[in-house]
Amino acid sequence: MYRYEISNYAKPGFACRHNDGYWTGVWYAGFGLGASSLLNHTRYRNTEHMEEYLTAAPEQLAGYREAEPLTQNDEMEEFMFLGLRRMAGVSESEFKKRFRRTIREVYGEIPDSLIRHGLLARKGDRYFLTPEGMNLSNYVMSEFILISSEQQQKHRTD
């Protein structure tokens, strides 16, 4: 068995390909009560109530109740913290291809600081968690949450 994701192990050739789509940001459609979808930069969530689901207007996406448009910051955050769950980590070139900015342009010194503290490593194009980084993964991933200037201002005045 080998570890292919922070909380998943598998025999060679048996890693879950289904979940890999979530961790790499592939768009997906969910059907049924309480299902979630990620389509066209929007996260959808279906109702959990059968009656509401069955009587949904035809123009609704299979009875969705919530639609949350994702900002580019939302998508960059998810790219980083979902990608860092995987032992393969995140690719600098894939980040740049997807967002037209480098990880350093977006996150400044954060990756280098995490590397200096032994929580993150870089090999070639990829950043990935070290064994100690896996133990402190919530902290590491929280470092990749982008705070808008409005949130920063509110935080300063609170």
Residue ranges and their predicted role:
Residues 132-158:
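Short, amphipathic alpha-helical interaction segments positioned at domain boundaries
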Residues 100-116:
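Short amphipathic alpha-helical interaction segments
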Residues 126-130:
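Minor-groove-contacting beta-hairpin "wing" of winged helix-turn-helix DNA-binding domains
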Residues 1-101, 151-158:
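C-terminal scaffold of the Radical SAM
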Residues 115-125:
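A short, conserved structural fragment
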Residues 51, 74-81, 108, 134, ...:
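Non-catalytic, well-ordered alpha-helical scaffold segments
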Residues 15-19, 117-118, 135:
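Short secondary-structure transition/capping segments
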